[in-house]
């Protein structure tokens, strides 16, 4: 899944076209409000501008009562991840998830996979997004132990810190989607990264 905020829109589209013969492709859209996480993301209208993408997932790093949710839920996104930590109670979370079948949960890297699975069991959520890094903070040393993904049967989208070695590790794992950003693709070694990904 290509991270939309990591490059110019036309470069995202070109990368999508070059990789689509080799991977099940998606575009990953980050929405941030500057409060829930200390950065800003793209606007919801950008989702419906991606006419080439067969699958779009939204990672909403925003408060659960942000008015932007109305616009987000109007988009054509296939999956929309709302942060478990943004809700004041599980009842509020459950009520929110009932608004749209596309809504799933995202988690900051404070929870073990077992804890996430237990939460998803309680809330009847069949897939989740895992922030391998804390959201919105560029330079971090700690990284989630992705070996523990073997402990869940749910589909997991891994966002943050994905490297070429991570892609190789999970390339043949159908229940894991990796968000490809600046560490794996969109950097000064772009062409070499592409060649590595398609070889």
Which residues does each PLM region occupy?
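Short, motif-level signal for alpha-helix interfacial/capping segments enriched in acidic residues
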Residues: 1-21, 144-150
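Catalytic beta/alpha-barrel core
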Residues: 3-8, 26-40, 53-93, 102-116, ...
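Catalytic cores of alpha/beta
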Residues: 14-19, 64-75, 111-123, 158, ...
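Surface-exposed amphipathic alpha-helices with a cationic face
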Residues: 20, 47-51, 93-100, 146-153, ...
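A short alpha/beta connector and helix-capping loop motif
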Residues: 35-70, 165-185
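Charged helix-capping and loop-helix junction motifs
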Residues: 39-47, 118, 140-149
């Amino acid at each position: 899944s290509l991270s939309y905020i990591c490059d110019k829109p036309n470069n995202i589209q070109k990368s999508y076209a070059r990789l689509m013969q080799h991977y099940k492709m998606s575009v990953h859209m980050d929405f941030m409000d500057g409060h829930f996480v200390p950065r800003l993301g793209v606007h919801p209208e950008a989702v419906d501008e991606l006419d080439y993408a067969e699958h779009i997932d939204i990672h909403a790093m925003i408060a659960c009562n942000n008015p932007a949710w109305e616009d987000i839920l109007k988009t054509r996104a296939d999956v929309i991840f709302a942060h478990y930590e943004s809700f004041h109670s599980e009842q509020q979370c459950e009520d929110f998830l009932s608004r749209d079948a596309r809504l799933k949960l995202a988690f900051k890297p404070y929870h073990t996979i077992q804890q996430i699975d237990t939460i998803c069991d309680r809330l009847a959520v069949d897939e989740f997004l895992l922030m391998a890094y804390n959201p919105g903070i560029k330079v971090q040393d700690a990284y989630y132990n992705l070996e523990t993904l073997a402990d869940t049967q749910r589909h997991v989208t891994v966002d943050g810190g994905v490297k070429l070695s991570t892609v190789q590790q999970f390339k043949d794992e159908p229940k894991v989607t990796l968000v490809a950003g600046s560490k794996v693709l969109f950097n000064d070694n772009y062409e070499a990264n592409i060649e590595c990904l398609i070889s």
